Amino acid sequence: MVLIRVLANLLVLQLSYAQKSSELVIGGDECNINEHPFPVALHTARSKRFYCAGTLINQEWVLTAARCDRKNIRIILGVHSKNVPNEDQQIRVPKEKFFCLSSKTYTRWDKDIMLIRLKKPVNDSTHIVPLSLPSSPPSVGSVCRIMGWGTITTTKVTYPDVPHCANINMFDYSVCRKVYRKLPEKSRTLCAGILQGGIDSCKVDNGGPLICNGQIQGIVSWGGHPCAQPHKPALYTNVFDYTDWIQSIIAGNITATCPP
């Protein structure tokens, strides 16, 4: 049954990629309720407001950005509407958190990644299914998918009740280097967006997934301010570069180190 659910959700994703890229996270269309069983929403015990997102990669582990670390994190799985919970919605807290560096330091172009082990594993359900880690890096020119509960307008902060989705394009890293002059010659980040602007991940989407061919290829990290400007793609942590570290941590090797 779990395999059937996974295959069904991959089919939904493939159909989504075939759509015309007119959907927006900024001011755009709502995700289909059955399209996103793997994203999770993060909030703190003190505040019920979502501040970041993440991705369930198996029943016990969530992948997100290092910049999303907080005290007393609460992780909501199986959520669509913030105001009308799904029957299979579940809430978990971290058991352990892992970073590339013990100091939890990261930069805009390096090591913005955090792996969270849940205190209690989740059960797969209609709206809770893990997303696969990448088997290979994404190709330049790929059409990928972003989704999240981040702001849907650029002139002011407007948070939606349900997540919004968009298709964006994968660019060569050099495209982002031309825009963001402080980027190093090489980094473990992906450059993706829409060059004419109007489509982008934005505030509170941080930590959420960039999905290509049914796999998590990126983690929302940072971009231009305000979001969705022309010729200013966003940057995403390149998950493929960290797969060995992720798999080592999950296997119990908690001293595993990230690639330099």
UniProtKB/Swiss-Prot annotation:
Organism's domain of life?
Eukaryota
Q: What does this protein do?
A: Snake venom serine protease homolog that may act in the hemostasis system of the prey.
Q: Which InterPro entries match?
A: Peptidase_S1_PA, Peptidase_S1_PA_chymotrypsin, Peptidase_S1A, Trypsin_dom
Q: Which residues are glycosylated?
A: 123, 253
Protein name in UniProt: Snake venom serine protease homolog 2
Question: Which SMART domains does this UniProt record tie to the protein?
Answer: Tryp_SPc
Which UniProt key words apply to this protein?
Disulfide bond, Glycoprotein, Hemostasis impairing toxin, Secreted, Serine protease homolog, Signal, Toxin
- Grouped into one coarse class, the protein's main location is secreted
CDD domains in the record, alphabetically?
A: Tryp_SPc
**Positions of the propeptide removed during maturation:** 19-24
**Which Gene Ontology molecular function entries are recorded, alphabetically?**
serine-type endopeptidase activity; toxin activity
GO cellular component, as recorded:
extracellular region; secretory granule
Intracellular or extracellular location(s): Secreted
Its signal peptide is 1-18
* Disulfide-bond pairs as recorded: 31-165, 52-68, 100-258, 144-212, 176-191, 202-227
